[in-house]
Amino acid sequence: SGTVMPTVSGAIAAIVGDRLLGRDVVCPLAPDTRIAAASAERVVDALIAVHDLPAAAFGHTRAMNLPSLSLTLAELADASARAAEGAGVRVGAMRWQPEPRFQLAVDQWPKRFESARASRAGIRADASADEIVAAYLRDNPRALA
């Protein structure tokens, strides 16, 4: 029947991590909830790129949004299922059970981040939910059931 995650970030992370371990997941958000997402791999690449930029590249501020992929939680769940299938392992079941307090919070989040400055520096977003899941698996080689 699955475990309800007590935090929003935990609920979103479980769509990939727990399901790839064969655990059933109950998500307190609707499947069509859209979020801005980035793999840890893309974030690390961005931090290295920013570190290597000359100070002049920043202009008057060093603040910069990192680009992200806009995706729905259903797209993330589907990508997890495809990754498990491709690896020949059982993916945990996915059940959607929206809770108004969580849904309201996430509905207020940005759905995408774009940054011309980041693009000029060669920093890019993940191309797809499948790319995010593949990066997760590279970072967590024992993440499959």
Task: Go through the PLM ranges and name each one.
Residues 24, 55-56, 141:
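Generic structural signal for secondary-structure transition and capping sites
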Residues 37, 70, 112-113:
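Short aromatic/basic micro-patch
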